[in-house]
Amino acid sequence: MSYQYPMDETWSTEEIIDVVNFFSLIEKAYEKQVDREEILALYRRFKQIVPSKSEEKKLFTQFQEASGYSSYHVVKKARETNESNIRM
C-alpha cells in the first residue's frame, strides 16, 4: 500500500482510527472477504463522523483514486445482499 487514506485534520484520534478501519475493511473486501455486518457497522460509524453526503462522496472518490477500490460498491453490495460475507 503506497497511498494514504483520506482524512480530515479536524477529526479526533479516535475518529481517524475508525475511518482508517473502515477504509482498511474496504480494501480487505477486494483482496479477501469480509463479514457483511462488520462492513455495515463500520459504515454506520463512518456516517457518524462524516454525516454529509457530499463529504462522504469526496472521501470515497479520494480513496478510490488512490487505491482503485470503490467504497460505494462495497457498501451497496453489503446493503443489498443477505450473504454473510462480502467479496468484490
UniProtKB/Swiss-Prot annotation:
It comes from the Bacteria. InterPro entries: BH2638-like_sf (IPR023324), UPF0223 (IPR007920). Pfam families: UPF0223 (PF05256). Coiled coil: none annotated. Gene3D superfamilies: BH2638-like (1.10.220.80). Belongs to the UPF0223 family. This is UPF0223 protein OB1419. It comes from Oceanobacillus iheyensis (strain DSM 14371 / CIP 107618 / JCM 11309 / KCTC 3954 / HTE831).
